[in-house]
């Protein structure tokens, strides 16, 4: 048994070298919808490089609806998405968190004097909303929040991209309800304030999930998910 220990240790070292060599030769492809690409992914990729040194990571940023087909074609190894409203039997989803929402306010807007806002504060305020076709989660959330408050949103403009929405806020076209991580997009004069419900709790109704092809096996993806699960609370702030 004593003689076998060096052999076992050598075998483990060889296995590690083979695994690391394979990682160095492979490109690991992560898809992320824009909010996750802005807030969650940078620190995750940084830490993943420490777990798997030498691995080349390719980040593909796109809308959730466009990322899911790329999983099925093999163009992506994993994706961080808003889970779809229709079943996807070929894709495995693991819920990560419900992202909070914030209100983006134009330069000098009186509501910026508040530390936090309720939907009622946005009554009659011109609103920029996402396109319902390309961003159904965000659009439906905005409309539902006003409906629950028995209010009709004053829609001034629709736009698809978060950057465009925030730029329009900066141009004083209106305010916008956006995901928390969008607040990391810096546009001159735009102020972000947390959106809370009547109980004073953050409005957290934008789900975020990890997705991959159901039944597939990938040790790098497993390593990434282990890291993500262990640091999710840290990454979410």
Language-model regions: role of each:
Residues 1-20:
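Alpha-helical "hinge/linker" immediately C-terminal to small N-terminal DNA-binding modules
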Residues 22, 90-101, 105-127, 222:
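Flexible hinge/capping segments at coil-to-helix
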Residues 24-87, 159:
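Central regulatory/effector-binding core of bacterial HTH transcription factors
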Residues 29-31, 101, 117-137, 232-233:
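Short loop->beta-strand "edge-of-pocket" segments that line small-molecule binding or catalytic clefts
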Residues 40, 183, 191-237:
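A late-sequence structural motif
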Residues 63-68, 72-76, 132-193:
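Hydrophobic hinge/microswitch elements
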Residues 92-102, 177-183, 187-204:
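Short beta-strand->loop
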Residues 127-149, 218-226, 235-236:
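Secondary-structure junction motif
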């Amino acid at each position: 048994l004593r003689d076998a220990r060096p052999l076992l240790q050598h075998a483990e070292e060889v296995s590690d070298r083979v695994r690391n060599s394979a990682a160095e030769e492979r490109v690991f492809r992560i898809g992320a919808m824009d909010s996750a690409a802005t807030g969650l992914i940078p620190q995750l990729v940084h830490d993943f490089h420490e777990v798997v040194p030498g691995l080349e990571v390719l980040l593909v940023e796109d809308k959730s609806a466009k990322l899911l087909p790329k999983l099925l074609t093999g163009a992506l190894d994993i994706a961080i998405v808003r889970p779809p409203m229709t079943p996807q039997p070929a894709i495995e989803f693991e819920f990560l968190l419900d992202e909070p929402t914030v209100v983006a306010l134009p330069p000098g807007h009186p509501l910026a004097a508040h530390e936090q806002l309720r939907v009622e504060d946005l009554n009659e305020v011109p609103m920029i909303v996402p396109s319902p076709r390309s961003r159904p989660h965000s659009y439906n959330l905005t409309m539902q929040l006003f409906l629950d408050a028995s209010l009709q949103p004053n829609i001034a403009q629709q736009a698809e991209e978060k950057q465009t929405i925030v730029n329009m806020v900066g141009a004083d076209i209106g305010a916008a309800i956006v995901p928390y991580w969008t607040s990391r997009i810096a546009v001159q004069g735009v102020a972000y304030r947390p959106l809370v419900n009547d109980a004073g709790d953050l409005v957290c109704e934008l789900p975020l999930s990890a997705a991959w092809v159901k039944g597939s096996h990938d040790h790098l993806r497993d390593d990434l998910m282990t890291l993500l699960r262990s640091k999710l609370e840290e990454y979410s702030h």
